[in-house]
Structure formats: structure tokens, C-alpha cells
């Protein structure tokens, strides 16, 4: 596809923003969805201080900034900061003029109508996009796996959803949301490490814990069994070197942390785990399509990257499903970015080119056009 007119694909997650060009097989830019503002005016003398920083720059200067996430639980809650993130995406990360490229954005399942309209309005009025489309994240993940029917468990940093999809359409009545995701697991690991006598208190230190989580945590196939193994020997222990050179040891925390996905009571939440939520979602669907859903359970998002998670899901859902049911868990290696990849695939399809909302259509109908063209 000609780079001049390549569509831009932006997947705005609660934790990370993934952006790039339609037709590429991976996003060109992946950066934290954060906006930072100086805690104290004029601390950094002669640094030419800006009033706000976005993404990696905010992350690296986090010591002197207050960091805010404009996307909470998958939903945009702060539009001024969101605009800053989009501006940064176009001009600093991708280095493109947004008025020259169609823009595909992603949205959380069950995103409020007013939010879709606001996104549409900002893209056309602030950034002058020539064409625009918004697609549901889980649907894109399913496309990326080469399917049009299945149930997607999409778990990122801020929220998890189970989304049953039939022939390319999400079934809204059966979508379930679980407010338990990567950020909560990081917080839980902080608590577990605290009990071990390793205090991590500042936002900067939480980032270290996030790294520990990503590098060392895994999902146990049998939690009780694993706890016994951990108690009896040190074979499950790993060490981690902190930035200051101190080395800490982490044992059963490695699998206790992600176990909260299956047992939210660990976090004090009265919610069903990801396996049960997936099952409940399937049970809200028509009897006739359940077999297709059980046979196509697709994992998506960074919080599904733990080793052992697919086997555990297989075990749990098989025990919930009817005994003769064939259960298949699909865990693509690139699932951290599968929403973005699905967007890249969709936006470069020749059949999709008639689906864009054009600037002209927007000017004639206003923001509500998004409900007619994007579903």
C-alpha cells in the first residue's frame, strides 16, 4: 500500500498506546498512555520546562512529575489529556500530518455513545482527518487471529472484557466487563512484596514492580499444588536486580500475583475470575452458537501474556463446559498487539475502503454519524 495514503491505526489502551500504519505487521510506536505535569513550577532551572509531557518522556521524568492516565478502565475520562496523547502520536511518534491520512481508532467494548461522538469530533475538527473509523478492540483481535466468530478475552492494563463475536459482530448483551487487569495485578504484587519486607511506594517504584511482574510472574496450572511446591523448596525462587543494585528474591509471589485473575477475592473483589466470566459470557449467547465460541476462545492483550495462562484457561473452562464440548484456547504469540494488528488488517482491506466516515459525511451529519457507520 502506498505510504502517502496509508491509513493510521491507533489503539488507545489504558496503559499503552499502540500506533502505526495500516498494512504494517506491527505498530511503529508503543508508548505509555500518560500525561505528566511538573509537581513544582520551575524546579528544573534552564531545562526549558514544558507544562506537560507525554508517553516515554513523561515516564523518564516521572520523578518530578505528577502522572495521569486519561484512559481509565478502557474508557477515555479526560479529553484534554487524550488530545495531547493523540497530538503526540501524530506529530512526535509517527511524524505525520493527520489531515493527510485516514485514521482508525479503537474503542473499548460498551464504550458510551457520547464518547464515540467525542472521538469522532476531535479527529475531524481538531486534527482535520480526511476520513475516520472506530472499531471495537476485541473484534480487531479476533480478525488478527484469522477468525470472524469466537469469544475474545481481552485483558490489558486497565480493564478486562469477554466479548462474544458472531460473523464479525460483537454481541453486546453478552459482553462482560471485569475491572481487574494489569494495573491491579501490579498493585497486588506491590502488596505481596511489601509483606516480604520490600517497600515500593512511589509511582516510579511501581514501574519497577510492573517490570518484575512482566519478567517473572506466571500462571500455575494447579494453584494449591504450586503453593506446596513453593513452601517445600526454593526451586521456584528467582532473583531480580533493582536499579540501585540491590537484589531481591521473589518466590510464590510469582504465581500468586496472576492467580488473582482466576481468584479476584485475592484483591478483595467480589467478582468472577476470567475463566468464569468467559463461561458466563458464552452462556448469555444463543445455544446454537456456543459450540463455535467454546472452540474459539481467543486471548488478547498484555495481561494474557503470562506463561501457563492458556493451559489454565483450558483446564478451567473445560470443567465448566458440558462434558462433550470441545474447548480450544487460542493464544497467538503476538497477542499483546493483536488489537493493533487487527486494525492494520482491517484498514488495508480493499473492501473496507467504503466503510470510512469521510470529512464530507461528517460535515453533513455531525458526530452522530459514527453510530450509523461504525458498528
From Swiss-Prot:
Catalysis performed (reactions): ATP + H2O = ADP + phosphate + H(+)
Listed EC numbers: 3.6.4.-
A molecular-function term among this protein's GO annotations: hydrolase activity
GO CC, any one term: cytoskeleton
Protein family (similarity comment): Belongs to the actin family.
Organism of derivation: Phaffia rhodozyma
Primary location recorded for the protein, binned into one broad class: cytoplasm
Stretches of the chain forming a coiled coil according to its record: none
The protein, known as: Actin
Gene3D superfamilies, per database record: 3.30.420.40, Actin, Chain A, domain 4
Functional description taken from the UniProt entry: Actins are highly conserved proteins that are involved in various types of cell motility and are ubiquitously expressed in all eukaryotic cells.
Keywords: ATP-binding, Cytoplasm, Cytoskeleton, Hydrolase, Nucleotide-binding
SMART domains, sorted: ACTIN
Highest taxon listed in the record's lineage: Eukaryota
